[in-house]
């Protein structure tokens, strides 16, 4: 019985795909509504709904389409984190023996887009509005593998520190809550029976840059006192002051970057 049902369903699908021109004339709005699903490293899983009909009688509307979409990394979190972990394998050196490791990405965004097909083909230009957030958590660490008995020295905001041991660990977090206009381009490649493959690539001109927060544990941490030319346990106030200075310097550099990139690949179906 199941084989018969699947066989009849396949026949119905084939007939609906390859029916000849004797079918009744469809209303003007048919064959334009579409929905799709895609993936992106900076957005995760994306779903959208929209409309584009290049056969409209209007000499202007036939060149345009519209889409609204939502995206989140939650369904693909393990895959994205594994990709980041492979990229940061053994850590990424940022100087003074300090490395970044174990990145964890959380992101989401919504968008309202207008597509322009200048040649009524597969290529389109896209503009619109995007809002969302991105959070990247990472571990920072340092060690001296060749000399396990030595102290680990490093500089922070101009002050000289060391941990009472040959390693240290901390964390860095980047938060980016944004909104702004989107500009990009893309392609829609028809496959068969209303199915298509799409590519989107563009940037969001964000209203604000990302912000970094740095956390360094103070236990077993010593600072060099320039006035007495001696080492001593760091006070929480002194460490917080240097951490704030380091964050300010990092955020000043981040303020020069306000473009949030987006590249998406996926499939769509036009009704």
Q: Residue spans of the language-model regions?
A:
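Extracellular/periplasm-exposed beta-strand and loop segments of Gram-negative cell-envelope proteins
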Residues: 23-27, 36-38, 72-110, 133-179, ...
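Positively charged n-region of N-terminal signal peptides that target proteins for export
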Residues: 1-4
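Transmembrane beta-strands of outer-membrane beta-barrel proteins
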Residues: 31-37, 47, 62-68, 112, ...
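Transmembrane beta-strands of outer-membrane beta-barrel pores
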Residues: 39-43, 53, 70-76, 118, ...
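A contiguous pocket-lining binding segment that forms or flanks enzyme active sites
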Residues: 169, 176-193
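N-terminal signal peptide c-region/cleavage motif recognized by signal peptidases
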Residues: 14-16
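Secretome/extracellular-domain signature
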Residues: 108, 115-120, 126-133, 139
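Short loop/turn motifs that connect adjacent beta-strands in outer-membrane beta-barrel proteins
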Residues: 20-32, 55-64, 119-122, 190-197
């Amino acid at each position: 019985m199941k084989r018969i049902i699947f066989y009849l369903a396949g026949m119905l699908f084939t007939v609906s795909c390859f029916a000849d021109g004797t079918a009744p004339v469809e209303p003007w709005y048919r064959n334009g509504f579409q929905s799709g699903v895609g993936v992106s490293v900076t957005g995760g899983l994306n779903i959208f709904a929209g409309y584009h009909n290049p056969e409209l009688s209007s000499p202007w509307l036939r060149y345009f389409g519209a889409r609204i979409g939502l995206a989140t990394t939650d369904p693909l979190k393990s895959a994205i984190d594994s990709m980041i972990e492979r990229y940061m394998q053994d850590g990424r050196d940022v100087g003074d023996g300090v490395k970044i490791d174990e990145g964890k990405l959380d992101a989401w965004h919504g968008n309202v887009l207008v597509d322009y097909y200048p040649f009524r083909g597969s290529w389109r230009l896209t503009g619109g509005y995007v809002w969302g957030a991105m959070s990247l958590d990472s571990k920072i660490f340092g060690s001296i593998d060749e000399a396990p008995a030595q102290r680990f020295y490093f500089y922070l905001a101009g002050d000289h520190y060391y941990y009472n041991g040959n390693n240290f660990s901390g964390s860095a977090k980047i938060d980016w809550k944004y909104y702004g206009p989107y500009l990009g381009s893309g392609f829609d490649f028809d496959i068969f029976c209303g199915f298509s493959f799409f590519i989107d690539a563009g940037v969001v001109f964000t209203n604000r840059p990302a912000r970094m927060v740095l956390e360094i544990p103070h236990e077993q941490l010593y600072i060099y006192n320039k006035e007495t030319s001696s080492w001593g346990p760091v006070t929480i106030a002194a460490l917080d002051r240097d951490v704030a200075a380091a964050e300010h310097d990092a955020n000043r550099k981040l303020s020069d970057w306000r473009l949030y990139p987006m590249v998406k690949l996926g499939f769509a179906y036009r009704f």
